[in-house]
């Protein structure tokens, strides 16, 4: 019985990984609307990797999505990333995972960080050539323990 419980525990979901997603307005994501996340770290003694994830539907009009991502400690921006998601290939095929009308892509924006290094993340869609990006359904972060 103890062996079976140990095996079950070893196969259980990793409790130290967290994710947060924010739904985007149906009428589009405005350049003037930054998205802010407060990463949740399950164990302050571990180092973490953070991924930025986007979800879009098949009505998204562009081949890419270019974002500015600020990693902020308690007082200042510690790192600014320009992140470019290739949403579709040159033939118009959607990239990432998904089915039906919804797709998700993710990219690592921080690796092997201590929880005290990043207390908030702000995402801007300032790099796109339009004021309002439509058909991005959700923006999120995925925080997982570093493997290194």
Residue ranges: model-predicted function:
Residues 7-10:
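C-terminal motif of bacterial Sec signal peptides marking the signal peptidase cleavage site
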Residues 56-59, 103-105, 125-134:
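Short acidic/polar inter-strand loop motif in beta-rich domains
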Residues 61-67, 135-138:
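Short coil-to-beta strand junction motifs in C2/discoidin
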Residues 82-112:
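An anionic, turn-rich surface loop/hairpin at beta-sheet edges
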